[in-house]
Amino acid sequence: MKMKNIAAVAMAGCMAASLAACGGSASSAASSAASTEAATSEAAEATGTSANGFTVQLGPNPETLDPALNSAIDGANTIITTFEPLLLIDENNEVVPGQADLPEVSEDGLTWTFTMKDGLKWSDGSDLTAKDFEYSFKRLACPDTAAPYAETVVGMIDGYEDAIGNPDADGNTTTDPDWDTLNVHASEDGKTLTVQLAYPCSYFDKLCAFAAMSPVQQATVEANGDAWCTQPDTFVCNGPYMITDWVPSERIVLSKNPNYKGGWDSSKIVSDTITLLLLEDSSAAYAAYNSGEAQLIKDVPTDEIPSLTKAEDGGRLLC
C-alpha cells in the first residue's frame, strides 16, 4: 500500500468534511472550486474509485439524526451534511450566510432580524420559510423535546424561562411550560425571522450556525414522532445531501439534494453520493479500506501502525 494513496484519500475526505462543516460557502468557494475538483480527481485516480461518489467510515449506528437531540460527533457529521441552519461558519471561522443573509442587529444587541434567501426548499420539494425556523427554535426550548443543547443555544432568547416553566433552584417547574413564549417570530410572509434576546449575546450569530439550530419540518415530525429521522422516506432535510438508503449497522447513503439552495456553492458539491459505513471496529474498517470498499477510515488497528509507518515513497502515517 502506498502512502500517496492514503494521502489522496484523506484529501478527499477532508474536502467532504470542509464542505459540510466549515469551508466552501458561496462567499468563499470561487477561489477554491478549481483546486477542489482537481484534488477530487487525483484522489479518485489514486484509489481507483469514481469521482462521483466515495465511501467513508462513520462509526456506530447514530443514536439520533434529529438536530435538536443529537450530542454525538458521528451524528453531527451526518447532520451538518444533510441540514443547514440560518448561518454557516467558513474555513476562516467567520460567520457567512446559510439559509438566511447575515442578520441585522439592533444597537442594543437585543433584536436580531434574519432575511431568508429566496426559493428555499425542503428535500421533498415543499417550501421552507422563516416559519420553519420559528417552529424549530421553539421546539428546541420545549422541555418535552429534552434537547441537550437547548439552554446553550436558545437560553439567551427572551421568554426562555417561561418556555421551560420557570424552574426553581432544584429544577422543578413553577409554571406551566409554554414554548410559544420564546420571543422568536416569523413574518406573515415567511420571509423574515426576528429573534429578541433577553440580554446581549455577541456570539449569537455563531450559535445560529450550530447544528442544533437547523430547521426540522413540523408536519413530518408531528406525523412520525421520534421515528421521523430513522427512515429515508421520512427524513426530510434541507442541506446539500439527503439520505436515500439506510441499512442499520451497515451503511447510510447520502445523495445530492436536488432541491438544495443555501450557503454552499453548488460547484463545491462534487460528489453525487457519500456512503457512510457503520463500522466501529478498527480491524473491520481497515479491511474495508484494503479491499477498496472504503476510501477513508477514522483509525487503524494498533498492530498495523508499524507497517504503515514503513510505507513506500517516504510517506508517513496519516491518522
Segments predicted by a language model, with ranges:
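Gly/Pro-rich hinge or "lid" segments in bacterial periplasmic/extracellular proteins
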Residues: W179, L197-K268, T273
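Surface-exposed binding/hinge segments that line
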Residues: E134, P148-A219
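N-terminal lobe/hinge region of extracytoplasmic solute-binding protein
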Residues: Q57-E107, V236
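Aromatic- and charge-enriched surface segment that lines or borders ligand/interaction sites
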Residues: L102-V153, T194
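Short, well-ordered beta-strand elements
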Residues: S50-P60, T111-F114, F133-S136, L193-T194, ...
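Ligand-site clamp/hinge motif
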Residues: N259-S307
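Ligand-binding "clamshell"
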Residues: P306-C319
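Bacterial lipoprotein signal-peptidase II cleavage site
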Residues: C22-A33
